[in-house]
A protein has these predicted regions:
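Active-site-proximal cap/loop segments of hydrolase catalytic domains
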Residues: 506-707
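Blade-edge beta-strand/turn elements of extracellular beta-propeller
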Residues: 135-137, 179-191, 236-248, 286-296, ...
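Long hydrophobic segments that form regular secondary structure
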Residues: 247-324, 329-334, 341-346, 357, ...
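A flexible loop/linker signature enriched in serine peptidases of the S9 family
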Residues: 112-119, 141-145, 164-173, 188-193, ...
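Cap/lid segment of the alpha/beta-hydrolase catalytic domain
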Residues: 138-154, 163-170, 180-186, 419-425, ...
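Non-catalytic accessory segments flanking enzyme active sites
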Residues: 58-153, 163, 253-308, 339, ...
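Beta-propeller blade signature
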Residues: 123-124, 175-179, 223-235, 280-285, ...
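Bacterial N-terminal signal peptides
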Residues: 7-18
């Protein structure tokens, strides 16, 4: 009864049509509304802006156009915006490389000359020579909205298959290119989503996963189910692809396949949505009639295939080891797990098998440490890193004597290294030449207490010489979900923010993967509130320790991090000066009804379960906006082609906030066109959006920018 009253009361408040102070200043457009009321477990909840869930209706299109006009007019009028964009463009304009990988003496890597919208794929046999351009996505669309989404090369380096994503969509189209000639073959695969590709060792074809063709009108909004694993025979139409595995009885399962280094087995990783706990199946490729074997079918832990020695498979897992360990399983015998490398005090983030060694990347308080182990699991030294940052890559094969990796930090642009196993030494392969001095900036790591006493780490980066007077404009970023770790990384956008005099802080919230599965579990489902408490405590730490003040503090996050921002400003609107939620999940009662939203129930829960509903409703940002409350200045960002977190979340959140705002602080929404959830976004669009974000902060936080 109490729940019903609160729900109806909130709905009634939001449906009132009055002119608030903010509306009077900005004259927000009237959003299309309805009398929609839903009932959840006996609780009636109004959803007045339900029509905005259809972004293609004439009413929604008119609203989007009107909102964008208000937002862009406001942003363009900020005097500092042009100067910010100019500096962003200068800082962004530096040559950068991706981590190389090798096939048959050929090195493949991505490169961007600086301001290219998309990275270009290159190949070479010698790094001292000029590489050969292999694939330039910039030539496929004038506006740079077609991006390379995936890649796999045959063992003889003769052919490659690659996926293309259009306008930021999760849907991809896969093609096959001749590496020697640089020309595409006739092979064309559609409706690929959430899939890699893996060639057979003889190069006759590759394995991949896809969905059935969706309804064209609703392909960016409708739910997707029934992933299927196929084998594509080179030179044949997609209609003749061989179905390898499907599970109609498990419509939410996702399949990714990998051919082992020796070519004998197909390893099938089976996941239900975003749940890190997965299953491992395999197929014996030496026997055309072999069936798929369900090796690990309980989904009782996370299992990542590392390598095999004949029928003995090696995995990284958190089974009985929340921080991770390495195990082996002899598939020719009864299921028995042998431990190769035991759990340590640090999170085992990734493992690869290269040059007769295991390369293990650990997280030590959210930054990387790399250790080497022999095949029997005995220690074999470490790979020294340049500092406190993030190392990634370490790809290769058993026969290789080298591997490649990247290193980055909040103040160090990504550098590429080659490690020689024979010499036990790293060689700097590439260091970018940038238009600023990294030595002018510093990062410190602090630890603070959350509401329940939990010790939480946070990185704080800024320009040296900063005065800690409690008045520094600060941008606090967080994510806190899905077992994803927020580790140090360089972004030109953040450098420019620090250059202007701002502080950039990243809180390592529960729900992430920084300290293993227990850390993740402490911020998911019915403990999700811990994530918001951690973020609020991070903000309070920055204020109490004289880094900033409420008036000078802004917060931001994307996707699950957008949810974080939405929840925190509805729970503590008094604590923040500005909020920048990006492609956020704002409607926790309907998220699972769109595209891949159902896949997030492993972290969020489901409104179909009574206990989950109570928790979801308790923090759902859309449902905790109170009319007349003064909320922080807000620039909400989303994209019209986001088919992961559909823009309806941001649309309804913005419309509700605009109707409720009780003071003259702006509530603006910036809706990017021909863009998706963020992956593959063109450089030009990133710079424009970043210029708008920083200009908004400059104006609302009162930051003075010198030319």
């Amino acid at each position: 009864m109490h729940f019903t009253f609160l729900a109806l009361a909130a709905a009634g408040l939001l449906m009132l049509v009055q002119t608030t102070a903010a509306e009077a200043q900005f004259k927000y457009p009237a959003a299309p509304t309805s009398n929609q009321v839903d009932e959840y477990k006996g609780v009636k909840i109004a959803d007045p802006y339900r029509p905005l869930e259809n972004p293609d209706s004439p009413e929604s299109r008119a609203w989007i156009e009107a909102e964008n006009k208000i937002t862009f007019d406001f942003l363009k009028a900020i005097p500092e915006r042009d100067e910010i964009k100019k500096r962003l463009t200068e800082v962004w304009d530096y040559e950068r490389f991706g981590v190389p990988f090798k096939e048959d003496g050929h090195y493949f890597f991505s490169k961007n000359t600086g301001l290219q919208n998309q990275n270009v794929l290159y190949a070479t046999t010698n790094f001292s020579e000029a590489p050969r351009e292999l694939l330039d996505p910039n030539l496929l669309a004038k506006d740079g909205t077609i991006a390379l989404g995936g890649l796999d090369v045959t063992e003889d380096a003769r052919l490659m298959t690659y996926g293309l994503a259009n306008a930021g969509s999760d849907w991809q189209q896969w093609k096959v290119r001749d590496v020697t000639t640089g020309k595409d073959r006739q092979d064309l695969l559609d409706w690929v989503k959430f899939s890699n590709a893996s060639w057979k060792k003889d190069g006759s074809g590759f394995f991949y996963s896809r969905y059935d063709k969706p309804d064209e009108k609703d392909k960016l909004r409708s739910q997707v189910y029934n992933h299927k694993l196929f084998f594509h025979q080179l030179g044949t139409p997609q209609s003749e692809d061989k179905l390898i595995y499907e599970r109609p009885d498990q419509k939410e399962w996702l399949f990714n396949a990998e051919v082992t280094d020796d070519g004998r087995y197909l390893i099938i990783t089976v996941q239900r949505g975003t749940d890190p706990k997965n299953r491992i199946f395999y197929k014996n490729l030496a026997d055309p009639n072999s069936k798929v074997v369900e090796l690990l079918d309980k989904a009782d832990a996370e299992y990542n295939f590392v390598d095999n020695e004949g029928p003995v498979f090696v995995f990284r897992t958190n089974l009985d080891a929340p921080l991770g360990r390495i195990i082996s399983i002899d598939t020719s015998k009864a299921l028995k797990i042998d431990e190769l490398i035991s759990e340590s005090k640090d999170k085992l983030e990734a493992v690869s098998s290269v040059g007769e060694r295991f390369v293990a990347v650990y997280l030590q308080d959210a930054h990387s440490a790399v250790k080497l182990f022999k095949r029997d699991g005995s220690p074999d030294g470490e790979i020294a890193l340049p500092g406190l940052g993030t190392a990634a890559g370490f790809t290769g094969k058993r026969k290789d004597s080298e591997t490649f990796y990247s290193f980055t930090s909040f103040t160090t642009p990504t550098e590429i290294f080659r490690y020689d196993f024979d010499k036990h030494a790293s060689e700097l392969l590439f260091r970018p030449k940038v238009k600023f001095s990294p030595d002018d900036y510093t990062t410190e790591q602090v630890f603070y207490q959350s509401a329940d006493g939990t010790r939480v780490p946070m990185f704080i980066s800024y320009k040296k010489g900063m005065k800690r007077d409690g008045q520094m404009p600060t941008y606090l970023y967080g994510y806190g979900g899905f077992d994803i770790s927020s580790t140090p990384s360089f972004a030109p956008a953040n450098l420019v923010w620090m250059e202007m005099g701002g502080i950039y802080a990243v809180a390592n919230l529960r729900g992430g993967g920084e300290y293993g599965e227990k850390w993740h579990e402490a911020g998911m489902l019915h403990t999700k509130q811990n994530v918001f408490d951690d973020f609020i405590a991070a903000a309070q730490y920055l204020i109490d320790n004289k880094f900033t003040s409420t008036q000078k503090l802004s917060i931001g996050g994307g996707s699950n991090g957008g949810l974080l921002v939405g929840a925190c400003i509805t729970q503590r609107p008094d604590l923040f000066g500005v909020a920048l939620p990006n492609v956020g999940v704002m409607d926790m009662l309907r998220f699972q009804k769109f595209t891949i939203g159902w896949a997030w129930t492993s972290d969020y829960g489901s409104v179909d379960k009574p206990d989950d509903f109570a928790y979801l409703y308790a923090y759902s940002p859309l449902h905790h906006i109170v009319k007349g409350c003064c909320y922080p200045a807000m620039l909400i960002t989303t994209a019209d082609h986001d088919d992961r977190v559909v823009p309806a979340h941001s649309f309804k959140f913005a419309a509700t906030l605009q109707a409720a705002q009780g003071c003259d602080k702006p509530t603006l929404i910036r809706i990017e066109t021909k863009a998706g959830h963020g992956a593959g976004k063109p450089t030009t669009k990133i710079i424009e959006e970043t210029a708008d974000r920083w200009a908004f902060l400059v104006k609302e936080l009162g930051l003075k920018v010198s030319k």
